[in-house]
From Swiss-Prot:
GO terms for biological process: protein repair; response to oxidative stress. Disulfide bonds join 85-138. Its main location: cytoplasm. Catalyzes the reduction of methionine sulfoxide (MetSO) to methionine in proteins. Plays a protective role against oxidative stress by restoring activity to proteins that have been inactivated by methionine oxidation. MSRB family specifically reduces the MetSO R-enantiomer. One of its GO terms (molecular function) is metal ion binding. It is found in: Cytoplasm, Cytosol. This is Peptide methionine sulfoxide reductase B6.
Length: 153
């Protein structure tokens, strides 16, 4: 079937708007009971943490980064790199873990968790970083929970 770009965009929007199995839906009051005030401000109100203030900016230990709101694994430490931007940076997410919403003509996208729709940060493209994707997923530390792959013996 031959479709116009407008029809393709509408079909994508319809697909994204469909409720997903396992999606977590809570009221703001319910979110406030499980998130700290700072987590709520970022995940639910789409705010941003102060540059360089996040606990995961300089962490390069092996493990998995999960959405702090719902525990959904969103990034592997193997995709993390030091971009010098002041927030944790990744070049790719775990497949199916994030949604992207275009904000700046294909150069910047808001990223949210596919399971709870929590705001994680932004993806910026074509900045010239020597990564496999030429993308920088600039993520708020407060939106993440790190699980180390290193176990105590």
């Amino acid at each position: 079937m031959n479709t116009s770009p407008k029809m393709e965009m509408e079909m994508k929007m319809e697909t994204k708007a469909a409720p997903e199995a396992g999606m977590i839906k809570k009221s703001n009051e319910e979110w406030r009971t499980v998130l700290s005030p700072e987590q709520f401000k970022i995940l639910r109100e789409k705010s941003i943490e102060k540059r360089g203030s996040g606990e995961y900016v300089k962490l390069f230990e092996e493990g998995i980064y999960c959405c702090v709101g719902c525990g959904n694994p969103v990034y592997k430490s193997t995709t993390k790199f030091d971009s010098g931007c002041g927030w944790p940076a990744f070049f790719d997410a775990i497949p199916g873990a994030i949604n992207r919403t275009e904000e700046r003509a294909g150069l910047r996208y808001e990223i949210t968790c596919t399971k709870c729709d929590g705001h994680l940060g932004h993806v910026l493209k074509n900045e010239g970083f020597p990564t496999p994707t030429d993308e920088r997923h600039c993520v708020n530390s407060v939106a993440l929970k790190f699980s180390s792959a290193i176990t105590s013996q």
